[in-house]
Amino acid sequence: FYQFFASFEFLEKQYFVSMFAYTLELLEKNETYHSYTSADKLSAFYFTFFEMATANRSFVIHLLKEDKNPMKNLGKLSKLREVYLEYALTILEKPIKIEQETVVKIQDKVLQEASWLQFLSIFNFWMNDESPNFEKTDVFIEKSVKASFDLAYNIPTQSVIDFGKFLWKEQMNGMFSKS
């Protein structure tokens, strides 16, 4: 065991990295994936990742709710965050073409972190989703990706309002109050 992992905590972190790697492996096997838009690539990633998470749902939820301290549980995603941010940088297009290197780095960081926050919000929604076949998580993914890309790359449109209505409805149904 110690030849591969320094601790059980590291093993838990590596579990999520392995899920990430397998998700990308599955996506890479899809011949059309490389021709997808950034939004479609991100959606495909989320759908595939959460399909895999669903296959191991009890274990994943156990890992992320094991400790009473939510920050300690979130720490189990630290290695996943590292690889996810690299992935996000490769697929997300810059909304504004800027020549100044410092500003480009800031823009890249903002895009990466916003994408990570979106991923965490989907993760949290999925953990609390009690709908059949986690259909509401699928809707959450669709609406949040559409709204975030509209906000970043276009003038916010109906998708932002649509996503807001969905969130409001789920808040009223108690989806976000569970933890």
Stretches with model-predicted labels:
Residues Y2-E28, T32, S43-F50:
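An amphipathic alpha-helix adjacent to DNA-recognition modules
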Residues D40-L64, K79-E93:
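Helical hydrophobic small-molecule/effector-binding pocket
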Residues N128-S179:
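C-terminal peripheral helix-coil segments that are non-catalytic and often amphipathic
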Residues I98-A114, F134-V139:
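All-alpha amphipathic helical-bundle segments outside canonical DNA-binding/catalytic cores
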Residues V60-G75, T102-V103:
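Short acidic alpha-helical/loop segments enriched in Asp/Glu that coordinate divalent cations
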